[in-house]
């Protein structure tokens, strides 16, 4: 099969995309496919037409490749592509929309509010905080509504003293989500397959205050370990990850992130429709423990590639 491998782009997650593409390229070669590298830029429609491929393997992360825009283009061009479709990708990218859906499905989320990037940078977010349901909480997390890899994610230890005025923000997200900080362990659950199944989970223990961009992509930034918790709560998180996958309308692959408290209550942090896919990323690590090889996931995604979904 002639496969167009799309990666890169002028986004905060360009380097992550290229790292994923490197591993995927090796897997495609092992599987015997013909590979055409397609680096994302403003002329992407022409690059895709010129490549004359049977299918697009989407190795993009973040804006354009993960938020439904590349998917919409490929739907119009009627070229099959991997991962989720246009609408599901757009929904999964927007943390606030996801939270609204989760609440409607009675899946626990962390309390918070949204604020524009402009209000954030001018410290007007404090007015919104004082009028929010978390006005009595001073320890908060702030993250872009539409971005990934913990880009521009901040731990606010004291909301009364914290200022964004001197902080340079790199995200293109127009809005931010500010939530109360709940102490707990971060649990990652992998969902794979056309008939979605939660294949396993792991706990992430960052070496810093939280699982930020540096912890995710630096050597020794975090430790991955088995989840030590009661069987009932582990089973509940696995079931909830599949429920989230189906609720958003995701396809073939997703990673749900949960916060597990010492009382074994869990909250969904977010869902990722296009999880990192280097050889050492979380999804391949969980899959390997379940006896699923990296190349098998790549082949499954190619086999299930489609457009218009």
Model features per residue range: what roles?
Residues 1-6, 91-179, 183-184:
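Active-site nucleotide/adenylate-binding loops and adjacent lid/helix of ATP-dependent enzymes
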Residues 35, 80-81, 109, 140, ...:
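Hydrophobic beta-strand scaffold residues
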Residues 278-282:
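Zn-dependent metallopeptidase/amidohydrolase metal-coordination segment
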């Amino acid at each position: 099969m002639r496969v167009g491998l799309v990666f890169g782009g002028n986004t905060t997650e360009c380097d992550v995309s290229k790292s994923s593409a490197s591993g995927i390229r090796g897997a495609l070669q092992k599987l015997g496919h013909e590979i055409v590298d397609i680096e994302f830029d403003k002329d992407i429609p022409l690059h895709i037409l010129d490549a004359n491929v049977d299918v697009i393997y989407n190795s993009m992360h973040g804006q354009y490749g993960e938020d439904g825009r590349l998917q919409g283009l490929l739907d119009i061009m009627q070229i099959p592509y991997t991962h989720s479709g246009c609408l599901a990708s757009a929904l999964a990218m927007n943390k606030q929309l996801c939270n609204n859906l989760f609440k409607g499905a009675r899946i626990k989320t962390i309390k918070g509010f949204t604020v524009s990037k402009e209000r954030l940078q001018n410290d007007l977010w404090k007015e919104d905080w004082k009028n929010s349901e978390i006005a009595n909480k001073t320890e908060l997390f702030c993250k872009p509504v539409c971005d990934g890899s913990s880009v521009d994610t901040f731990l606010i230890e004291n909301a009364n003293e914290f200022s964004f005025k001197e902080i340079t923000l790199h995200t293109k997200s127009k809005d931010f989500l500010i939530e109360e900080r709940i102490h707990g362990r971060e649990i990652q659950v992998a969902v794979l397959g056309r008939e979605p199944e939660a294949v396993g989970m792991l706990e992430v223990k960052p070496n810093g205050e939280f699982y930020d961009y540096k912890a995710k992509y630096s050597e020794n930034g975090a430790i991955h370990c088995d989840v030590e918790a009661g069987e009932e709560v582990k089973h509940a998180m696995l079931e909830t990850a599949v429920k989230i996958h189906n609720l958003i309308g995701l396809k073939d692959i997703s990673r749900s992130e949960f916060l597990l408290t010492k009382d074994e209550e869990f909250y969904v942090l977010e869902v990722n429709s296009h999880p990192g896919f280097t050889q050492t990323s979380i999804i391949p690590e969980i899959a390997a423990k379940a006896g699923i090889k990296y190349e098998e996931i790549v082949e499954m995604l190619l086999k299930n590639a489609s457009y218009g979904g």
